[in-house]
Amino acid sequence: MANKTVLFNKHLESDAKMVDFHGWDMPLNYGSQIEEHNAVRQDAGMFDVSHMTVVDVTGTDACAFLRKLLANDVAKLKVPGKALYGGMLDHNAGVIDDLITYYLTDTHYRVVVNSATREKDLAWIAEQVKGFDVEIVERPELAMIAVQGPNAKAKAATVFNDAQNAAVEGMKPFFGVQADSLFIATTGYTGETGYEIIVPEDEAQALWQGLLEAGVKPCGLGARDTLRLEAGMNLYGLDMDETVNPLAANMGWTIAWEPQDRDFNGREALAAIKAAGTEKLVGLIMEAKGVIRPGMSVFFTDGEGVEQQGTITSGTFSPTLGYSIAMARVPRSIGDTAEVEMRKKRVSVKVVAPSFVRNGKQAF
């Protein structure tokens, strides 16, 4: 039996096409993936992300533990509510998961991890916590709804109560605040403004219904994937996993090398990889007809005239741009053009930074 989120019946009410997603019954779309995608880029859309795993890390050693566990440094978080994105690495510097950590107090952090990696993540965290005065508490009684798009905050404001609206007023990106029963964060996976709202399960259906009545369009996994790829955001399992180090996954900016005496998991292996050089993740755009798909091969000739090869990690048709975009892991010597092998032919592509659309506009 697949797991169902507390919003399952709400999806059926909106005629969702349901699919299995890592053991969860989740909406693929509600009739038109393109319309859902465009709603988020132009107005407001919402996603059921209740399958994500919320974990509270509490105790006197909470900060010290997370400084060991994560490649980014939670000691940088000084203001309550501030959030941090980063990787949880194994001892070989492979990416176990990418996650967001919220600093609530010196003894309380909240971590949100991917659903597909839940069991692996929790097992790794339980192993690493030995010796630290820390309690790890999973919060399965919490649901999560992401409301994204240029009009998302205004429409959510009509559903929030006065205290909640006061709590989020002027809140900068990458913050979270507990406002009555809701934990409201200015984070997302679309490249648009908006909120990710953690809500008690018994209130989730009413919140979803309120947002629906406020004119927020329900969106499924299909639109979530095209939106995140346009935004150049990694998908765990495609763009990185335990066989990939963060420097080869466009996550170098999330590695806190300073202070030098912070011994985070995988640091020694990652430093050796950095010194030796590693592949990189780039963006590709193809204005010719066709769609670039994961697993396709990328070819280019380096500065010394030698043919080099890489692999597409994520690829799709971009509804916003009107042509195919992709992310590819390639040797660092790549220039600004390459070729992708499609149907036994090579098609020219442009190489760009892996970020295609932000706030509804072309980003490269």
Swiss-Prot record:
<dbReference type="GO" id="GO:0005829">
    <property type="term" value="C:cytosol"/>
</dbReference>
<dbReference type="InterPro" id="IPR013977">
    <property type="entry name" value="GCST_C"/>
</dbReference>
<keyword id="KW-0032">Aminotransferase</keyword>
<dbReference type="InterPro" id="IPR028896">
    <property type="entry name" value="GcvT/YgfZ/DmdA"/>
</dbReference>
<dbReference type="InterPro" id="IPR006222">
    <property type="entry name" value="GCV_T_N"/>
</dbReference>
<dbReference type="Pfam" id="PF01571">
    <property type="entry name" value="GCV_T"/>
</dbReference>
<dbReference type="InterPro" id="IPR029043">
    <property type="entry name" value="GcvT/YgfZ_C"/>
</dbReference>
<comment type="function">
    <text>The glycine cleavage system catalyzes the degradation of glycine.</text>
</comment>
<dbReference type="InterPro" id="IPR022903">
    <property type="entry name" value="GCS_T_bac"/>
</dbReference>
<dbReference type="InterPro" id="IPR006223">
    <property type="entry name" value="GCS_T"/>
</dbReference>
<dbReference type="InterPro" id="IPR027266">
    <property type="entry name" value="TrmE/GcvT_dom1"/>
</dbReference>
<dbReference type="GO" id="GO:0005960">
    <property type="term" value="C:glycine cleavage complex"/>
</dbReference>
<comment type="similarity">
    <text>Belongs to the GcvT family.</text>
</comment>
<dbReference type="GO" id="GO:0008483">
    <property type="term" value="F:transaminase activity"/>
</dbReference>
<dbReference type="GO" id="GO:0004047">
    <property type="term" value="F:aminomethyltransferase activity"/>
</dbReference>
<dbReference type="Pfam" id="PF08669">
    <property type="entry name" value="GCV_T_C"/>
</dbReference>
<keyword id="KW-0808">Transferase</keyword>
<protein>
    <recommendedName>
        <fullName>Aminomethyltransferase</fullName>
        <ecNumber>2.1.2.10</ecNumber>
    </recommendedName>
</protein>
<comment type="subunit">
    <text>The glycine cleavage system is composed of four proteins: P, T, L and H.</text>
</comment>
<dbReference type="GO" id="GO:0019464">
    <property type="term" value="P:glycine decarboxylation via glycine cleavage system"/>
</dbReference>
